[in-house]
């Protein structure tokens, strides 16, 4: 691809009424209740790092210091993570990748669920998602103890490592031309535009 690969995962506040299962991704990210609890980021094959802050601007600074805006950025559901990058004011990276899209093409015809957890199990990954997110219903960042924050970070980092592993597993099953299609599809969602005739 010619770019450094950045794999990311955001963890955000949710509750029984305010969640991605009850509203559109756009409505969720634009809602006044939206809060980033943490983000994890893996550059190429380097160890995954995580970061938290009470201020959204700090997330932008942390991610851009790592050069995320100059690389290929990967997530499992980039429509969600990409909207957060846009909310933070991070320039859209030159390449967008999504293991959810890759799984849609390679696993969905034979496998009912393409959640990250299901994909990792189906592909016999040594990485397994952890269930700590279920303990976070209705919990915002300020409510977390130091131990809870670190437990959640372990979950977040595992998601990023799992996404990175899944990408390398699935890329053997997709032609390289599909990356451009995935990137274009994501940009039509994240950077919608009208082309008007002169």
Residue ranges and their predicted role:
Residues 15-21, 30, 52-54, 64-65, ...:
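A short linear-motif detector with a strong N-terminal bias
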Residues 34-37, 41, 45-60, 71-171, ...:
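Active-site-proximal helix-loop-helix substrate-binding element of RNase H-like nuclease domains
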Residues 1-2, 64-70:
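Flexible, charged surface loops at secondary-structure boundaries
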Residues 20-22, 64-66, 111-112, 168-170, ...:
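Surface-exposed beta-strand edges and their flanking turn/coil or helix-capping segments
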Residues 1-34:
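Entry/capping segment at the start of metal-dependent catalytic domains
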Residues 4-6, 71-72, 93, 192:
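The start of beta-strands in P-loop NTPase/AAA+ ATPase cores
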Residues 16-19, 176-198:
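Common nucleic-acid-contacting/processivity interface regions adjacent to the catalytic cores
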Residues 27-33, 41, 63-66:
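Short secondary-structure boundary/capping segments within folded domains
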